[in-house]
Swiss-Prot record:
PANTHER family: NADH-UBIQUINONE OXIDOREDUCTASE CHAIN 4L (PTHR11434:SF0), NADH-UBIQUINONE OXIDOREDUCTASE SUBUNIT ND4L (PTHR11434). This is NADH-ubiquinone oxidoreductase chain 4L. One of its GO terms (molecular function) is NADH dehydrogenase (ubiquinone) activity. Belongs to the complex I subunit 4L family. It is a multi-pass membrane protein.
Length: 98
């Protein structure tokens, strides 16, 4: 495993650990998800260069578009829950009643 692959795997793992362990606020969970998406984007951007192939060049752009949609939807949900509940604490939200 090259050092570049190790750093991207470490960044993804740290983002995943952040999502699983630091779920007190919705904003921190969204930031950890964005970190995971950024590490996936960087990994998918460098993968076709290492293979010297042009067949997978559109995959990072597709992932970038989906992560932008995910960020917009997450921020819209955070604004809606903070307006209705007054906070973005995930412990105070009962998602079955929303």
């Amino acid at each position: 495993m090259t050092p570049v692959q190790l750093s991207f795997n470490t960044a993804f793992t740290l983002g995943l650990m952040g999502v699983t362990f630091h779920r007190a606020h919705l904003l921190s969970a969204l930031l950890c998800l964005e970190g995971m998406m950024l590490s996936l984007y960087m990994g998918l951007s460098l993968w076709p260069m290492q293979l010297e192939s042009t067949t997978y060049m559109t995959t990072p752009l597709l992932l970038l578009a989906f992560s932008a949609c995910e960020a917009g939807a997450g921020l819209a949900l955070m604004v809606a829950t903070s307006r209705t509940h007054g906070t973005d604490h995930l412990q105070n939200l009962n998602l079955l009643q929303c």
